[in-house]
């Protein structure tokens, strides 16, 4: 939904059509199965019924609601605003909060049965995992802090509760995610440019350093992975030649990072506001030399691996055959549009996000500074 607003700003989508589309999307989200206001992660696109044994996800709920918040502000439509408020209010963040080893944390998901996705480690109430690490969850804290049922002290304790390990590679230092996967640094910034927090950590600078470290690490393994040898970088989670894979780079927590040489183009799009020259050069290379990575209707494929598949022999000798993901996932299209637009100077999404009463309240409660 936030990406549709970028389309309006750039004159490629009709404002009234986007308003109607956003109304329909928010209405569909409201009808999805949920637990404590957390939406089911995967649902049948035609019926809205929960798909398989899908979990009820905090982060995917947050991403969807973030989009609704932006659309409500940009479209300035009373009905859309009303439905968005209902989604915001429905999320029972107080039920998601728990204490662990003296820290206030949010669970990651909820399941109905232990046989459900991620259900093996569920507690008696069905809660799974905890956001105890640095990852992509920053906007969840903003949404929770903006909820009137969450007292400010609890909201601030949640922000302070997750681990912030620091690591370096090639002179680039950042607070890092355990697996070193790049998308986690970019996703929160797509909705709002997180700057300096009350502890003095600049999250925008952190994302820049993580991006630079990822690039340096990938290039240091150019001898092993053809994708990196070609000048590509940006290891992250996504579709790979052998299925879904969570790739990463240093800094990471041992024994991470895992890597199979796959690069999601969305990582390079996400890095554009932080490293415009380096990310732009890699995207230009990808666009110019690998036309199969691009689709005129949906844009970049979800992943590229230049060293996957059977080798082929030609005039240049035996070389690996490139693999291009057949899928184009909307999640990656959205973040690519938001951060790509930000790299071109647009602040539409950021301004809209912080202007909504709920998110404005959350940002204020947490004492967060805006980077740009």
Features from the language model and the residues they span:
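Ser/Thr/Asn(+Pro)-rich, low-complexity disordered segments
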Residues: 1-372
